[in-house]
Amino acid sequence: MKMFKELNHVSITVTDVAKAREFYTGVLGFEEIPRPAFNFPGIWYGLGNGLSLHIILNDELVRPAVERETILARYGHFALWTEDADATAKHIEELGLPCRDVVSGPTGLRQIFVKDPDGNMVEFIGPTASKEAVRRMESPATA
């Protein structure tokens, strides 16, 4: 028996809701959607097709597991499909966000990984005109 119909939401924890809002709304351009009046702070974003991202305050958070200087695809993350990965990568570069930007050999898709202020990883994935690895730009500490 299949226990579910579809993915409903992805939830991540942050230590500062205002910084998360600045990143997800201001930098990435996510659209905030109504959130029930829970007894803890947070933000909800609509991602399309009924999927949402739930940002939850956990100010006692030790640090997420992805707190590392480098950005690697095998670290925990969620991925968002983009119809034009080249335009998305250009926009991320213009914003000056540290990222890992590669073309996957097995799939031929371009993958651009960024981190939010709490170290949670977000991947943008989609088709590209390039067939080779594009570039890797990471934080100045690892450049």
Protein language model features and the residues they cover:
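Core segments of cupin and vicinal oxygen chelate
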Residues: 13-52
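N-terminal beta-strand motif that seeds the catalytic metal site of vicinal oxygen chelate
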Residues: 1-19, 75-80, 128-143
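Vicinal oxygen chelate
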Residues: 2-3, 6-15, 43-47, 66-143, ...
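Short, charged/polar surface micro-motifs in flexible loops or helix N-caps
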Residues: 49-53, 59-62, 84-87
